[in-house]
Amino acid sequence: MCSNNNTSSGSYGELQLHDESSGSCRKKQKKDKVRRRGPGVAELEKIRLQEEYKPPLSSSPSLPNIDHHHHTLFAPASSVYDLVMTSPNFSFPEKLASTLPVFPISYGSLIPPAPIFQRSQHSLMMNLPNPSPGAGRFYQFIEPPSNQRSCVDSVSQFLEEENKKIFTAKKRPWPFLTDTTKPSVGPTTTSTIIRPDATQNRSMGITPVQETGTTTSNPIAIDSPTSIPRHYPRFIPLGLQYEQQQQKLKDLDETMQWRSKKPFYSFIPSGDPSNDDQEQRPCDLFGSAADHGIDLNLKL
């Protein structure tokens, strides 16, 4: 520091020296006021320049190889996904890259492996051996606790049972009978379908025929060689409708029988001897042709 000591008994030369010394102190103070950047800013700028001019990650020197067969080394999930999500032009600083654990990344390791249950099921279905630990892959069977059973055994048993069912189903004969089957001798238990034309067939003396081509009175079921296919109604009638149809058919049969007994030309005498006892009508008094049996006085 400069000290300004003013003395009253000083000469002119002393005052001049005092002015020079005070001027030199002022120059030194100006030099001390020069500001400098701290060391942190320079280092950050240097790192930024290195990142800009550094080649991408793909052309960087190969990473150190690690034994792939060692099952205890697993890359943390966060570091793997960080490496995948970063852009190819991005590169880690030298200080950060030295602290992070580095593992070789392959295409197969980026895809998450399937669960143990699913992998074993696919391998059993396709008859493929279990995948062996190869280069770039980690395969380790997770053994269940002692108080639990492994799910692989149950899956294999289930698949064996399914294969047995499929094999027996192939050997089983066709369950349905076709039209070209051999005749079977013995009482049949086929259900007959009652149709509206059944009563009409009975009145005409025709026995109803079942679907298999056999009559209901014959206990031996023999397929008829000339079976005519019938057109069945589209809708099966209900109980009340069926009774009404039966009643209509019955009335129709009665009317047909009554008409068959009555002569068509009622005005022609039938020639029965019972008609001789009847009284003579007034129209017969004027004359009639008894020889031919036709009434000539008939007025239409």
Swiss-Prot record:
Residues 25-38 have a biased composition (Basic residues). Residues 1-64 are annotated as: Disordered. GO terms for biological process: leaf development; negative regulation of DNA-templated transcription. Keywords: Repressor, Transcription, Transcription regulation. A motif (SPL) lies at residues 37-45. Expressed in leaves. A motif (EAR) lies at residues 294-300. Signal peptide: none annotated. Residues 43-54 have a biased composition (Basic and acidic residues). It comes from the Eukaryota. Coiled coil: none annotated. GO terms for molecular function: DNA-binding transcription factor activity. Residues 55-64 have a biased composition (Low complexity). InterPro entries: SPEAR. Residues 1-11 have a biased composition (Polar residues). Adapter-like transcriptional repressor recruiting TPL/TPR corepressors to inhibit TCP transcription factors. May be involved in leaf development. Homodimer and heterodimer with SPL and SPEARs. Interacts with SPL, SPEAR1, SPEAR3 and SPEAR4. Knock down expression of SPEAR2/TIE4 and SPEAR4/TIE3 by RNAi in a SPEAR3/TIE1 null mutant produces lines displaying epinastic leaves. This is Protein SPEAR2.
